[in-house]
C-alpha cells in the first residue's frame, strides 16, 4: 500500500528539524520503502511517498518526527487502480 506523507515544520522548529534531517537523512524503518521525497522550496512543507504493508512501520516513521513536524499520512492509489474502482462503481 502507498501512503503520501505531508508535513509542515512546526513553528519554532525549523532549525532543529533541518539539523535532524541533515544528521539522519530521515531513513524509513524496516517494512517501509521510500519512493520519493519532495521539499517545497522556500517553505516549511514537504511530501514523501512511501510503500509498505505494515502500518506499524508508518506509525514508527511518523512518530520519529512528531516532535518537530505536523504530519499527515494518507493512503493513495494510482490512476489505473482508481480507474478500476470507478469502472466497478459506474459500470464503465
Predicted segments, located by residue:
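Conserved, structured core segments of small domains
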Residues: 1-92
Amino acid at each position: 500500500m502507498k501512503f503520501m506523507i505531508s508535513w509542515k515544520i512546526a513553528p519554532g522548529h525549523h532549525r532543529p528539524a533541518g539539523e535532524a534531517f541533515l544528521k539522519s537523512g530521515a531513513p524509513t524503518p524496516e517494512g517501509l520503502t521510500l519512493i520519493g521525497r519532495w521539499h517545497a522550496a522556500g517553505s516549511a512543507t514537504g511530501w514523501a511517498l512511501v510503500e509498505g504493508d505494515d502500518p506499524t512501520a508508518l506509525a514508527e516513521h511518523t512518530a520519529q518526527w512528531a516532535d518537530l513536524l505536523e504530519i499527515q499520512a494518507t493512503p493513495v492509489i494510482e490512476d489505473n487502480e482508481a480507474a478500476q474502482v470507478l469502472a466497478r462503481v459506474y459500470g464503465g
